[in-house]
Amino acid sequence: MRIDIDTCEEILITITRNKTRSLLTAFGVFWGIFMLVALIGGGQGMQNAMQVQFEGFATNSGFAWPQKTGEAYKGFRKGRWWSLNIDDIERIRKNVDGIELITPSIARWGSKSVYEDKKFDCIVKGLHPEYENIEAQDISLGRFINDVDIREARKVCVIGKRVYESLFTPGTDPLGKYIRVDGIYYRVIGLSVAEGNISIQGQSSESVILPFTTMQRAYNLGRNIELACFTVKPGLKVTDIQPEVERIIKEAHFISPDDKQAIMVLNTEAMFSMMDNLFTGIRILIWMVGLGTLLAGAIGVSNIMMVTAVSYTHLRAHETRGNL
């Protein structure tokens, strides 16, 4: 590419004659690039941080739990408390075709876990092996609950990261050790290092997970459960099967079909979709602001070029008159 020295000299002279305008234009271009890069980086960082919070959750999962009834129905008063039970799990599994898997969950807050002279306030959860397909447990040592643990109601447990750090010295292998939870001893069979801050029934890092049947017996919970946790088959959405799930539960517990508050359903699929839409909007806004700032800088550059062209025209005109 051929460089026109005269043109470069004229541009340099014009820039030095209009120092303030030149500096402001240069700053505008710099600021536009900086804002675009900073906004893109900040938006991506925010998105990554939010994704970490939901890390490990199945995107096609749902969670149902009971609330007070909102309407009187078949002799039962409004405001009645009721409970889900194991039979509800079987009803839904057999009668809702779109269900991929469904499993019950129970939990107890404020429990005391003890190992030797160390103590930690933890959350005790009773789960089935299938639950790991809904919320990944990220087992770093040992294993998760299995079918034999459920069938034999074994006194074994999987502990969370904070439970381990509070009860054991760093580097200690917890597998095979016995911890006492609410007065009952359990053998540690696994260590979960799941880090997500958003978790069902409390954070995994602060949990002691027992086989579902073991917790039923230890706390005399009978057949009642707290959550029905499920995923839907590929190609379906939670909203596709949610009405049928609610209908089956309402029929079994004498709840009005029109009662909107008796059953709460957390739709993680809708949450993920909402988050994706939010960050799509943020990305569009970022590009609009960044490109707008760059455009302002480009207009400033074009102004300098225009000033250069005008100055050059006047200069040539004066030279022409002088020659005449």
What are these regions (language model features)?
Residues E71-W82, V114-K119, L191-G196, L221, ...:
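Structural beta->alpha junctions
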Residues T313-G322:
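Conserved small/polar residues in nucleotide/adenosyl-binding loops
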Residues M1-W31:
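N-terminal Sec/SRP start-transfer signal
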Residues T25-M35, R283-N303:
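Alpha-helical transmembrane segments of integral membrane proteins
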Residues T20-N48:
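Short, strongly hydrophobic transmembrane alpha-helices
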Residues Q44-I123, E130-N133, S166, Q216-R217, ...:
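Hydrophobic, regular-secondary-structure patches
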Residues K125, P129-I145, D149, R154-S256:
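Mid-to-C-terminal secondary-structure elements
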Residues M50, C229, Q242, S256-G290:
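Peri-transmembrane interface segments
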